[in-house]
A protein has these predicted regions:
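Bacterial Sec-dependent N-terminal signal peptides
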Residues: 1-22, 414
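Beta-lactamase-like hydrolase cores
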Residues: 19-49, 53-62, 126-132
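Soluble periplasmic/extracytoplasmic beta-strand elements of cell-envelope proteins
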Residues: 42-46, 54-56, 105-109, 139-143, ...
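Active-site-adjacent helix/loop patches that line small-molecule binding or acyl-intermediate pockets
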Residues: 89-95, 101-184, 213-255, 284
Length: 414
């Protein structure tokens, strides 16, 4: 009997595969998909609980991230601007108000708030009326000097559906002044002669009203719906935080690169072009995205605002119809990315053992985005604990059962 036990234990020790090794084998098997004969993938999984790299493949390869670039923008913004940051649009006037007549100009100062709507415009008109203004004898001036005069980002495709990068818009339309004039008239404010021009608001102008939206309000549609306009607006807030006016995209890139250096990856030749991922000039790695996710997780002031904004697998945002079953459903929270030939996914999940993980998967050269998404979904299901026998695991179970049976028989003989 003793010899039998030794033999069983020897066999067991020879073919035992730990749960982690089993998982790694399954992840390895996913990389044998025929799609990788004509495409490539870079990926990394980091065990946040154990604080170590769990799995990686081509993790440092430079790839186009598509909209997972928004993760880089969001994390940088929360780190640089703070979680209480607000987007602001302001209305000023010059001159004096006498007998209900404003003898001066109105200045509309755009702060590139992507959430400005008609309610904000109505509030501006109401506040003018509340000041006793019933007549405007002057100009309406738009101040868009917070950013450089570029309507589109670097490396954007000319035939794509790109948002215009104007700091004073309503619902992506350049209609702010028209809307303000209409609301002023609705509030019985007579404009002697509508004169509209562009210019910089004087430092001594009088503030009429400020309308604002929080960074959390902007992050939700930016991340869950992958809104490019919101992402670029946030990118220019990062740029403006440097104190430069007009803020330039290059200022935003500089801040992002400072954070990359701070997390220890500054020596890598990454290319940062925009904040949304629309640009074909962006080149990042799965390692960079994963390490930024780790950085966010380590800093509650970032993570507590980033995590709720991420799409939830099977529930909302761009992941609403993905991973609708299995252990990844409701578990994976991640940002998606899609451009022609590019499919990406990066975010957080919980493993079967309760460990918190962050990951990045960047598929490149996939002519059918559905293939990239299918691979990512399968990868996440396995990562979250989807069950499937792996060669050797069944034999381990049989050995364990045999060993337990032998122990029971031995106990009975005593």
């Amino acid at each position: 009997m003793k010899k039998t036990m030794i033999l069983l234990l020897t066999i067991w020790a020879t073919i035992t595969i730990s749960a982690q090794d089993s998982l790694r084998i399954r992840l390895d098997s996913l990389l044998k998909d025929p799609m990788f004969e004509t495409s490539q993938v870079g990926l990394m999984v980091y065990d946040l609980t154990a604080d170590s790299v769990y799995y990686q493949h081509n993790a440092r390869q430079l790839l186009r991230p598509a909209s997972t670039m928004k993760l880089v923008t969001a994390i940088t913004a929360l780190d640089q601007l703070g979680s209480s940051y607000q987007f602001r649009t302001r209305l000023y006037h010059t001159g004096t108000i006498s007998n209900g007549c404003l003898n001066g100009d109105i200045y509309c100062v755009g702060g590139f708030d992507p959430m400005v709507d008609m309610e904000d415009v109505k509030a501006f008109a109401h506040q003018l009326h509340a000041l006793g203004v019933d007549t405007l004898r002057g100009r309406i001036v738009t101040d868009c000097t917070m950013k450089e005069d570029l309507d589109y980002g670097e490396g954007w495709c000319w035939d794509d559906d790109n948002p215009r990068l104007k700091p004073l818009m309503i619902g992506r339309q350049d209609i702010f002044v028209d809307a303000l004039v209409e609301e002023m008239m609705n509030d019985s404010i007579f404009i002697e002669q509508v004169q509209v021009t562009n210019g910089r608001c004087p430092a001594d102008a009088t503030l009429v009203a400020t309308r604002s939206h929080t960074i959390d309000q902007v992050l939700i549609p930016m991340m869950k719906q992958s809104d490019n306009y919101y992402a670029e607006a946030l990118f220019y807030q990062i740029a403006a935080s440097t104190g430069r006016r007009p803020a330039k995209a290059s200022d935003g890139r500089h801040v992002v690169k400072k954070l990359i250096s701070h997390i220890g990856l500054g020596s890598q030749p990454y290319k940062i072009a925009d904040g949304s991922g629309l640009s074909l000039y962006n080149y990042l790695s799965a390692e960079l995205e994963t390490m930024l996710l780790r950085y966010a997780w380590l800093h509650g002031t970032i993570y507590d605002h980033l995590y709720p904004a991420l799409p939830v697998a099977g529930y909302d945002g761009t992941l609403e119809k993905r991973m609708t079953q299995g252990p990844a459903e409701g578990n994976v929270r991640a940002k998606t990315g899609t451009l022609t030939g590019i499919s990406s996914l990066a975010g957080y999940c919980e493993a079967e053992n309760g460990h918190q993980l962050c990951f990045s998967i960047i598929n490149q050269g996939v002519m059918r985005n559905a293939d990239g998404k299918a691979f990512q979904d399968r990868f996440c299901q396995v990562l979250c604990g989807e069950k499937e026998e792996v060669k050797g695991v069944k034999e381990v179970k049989e050995v364990k059962r045999s060993a337990r049976s032998a122990q029971k028989r031995r106990g009975r003989r005593r």
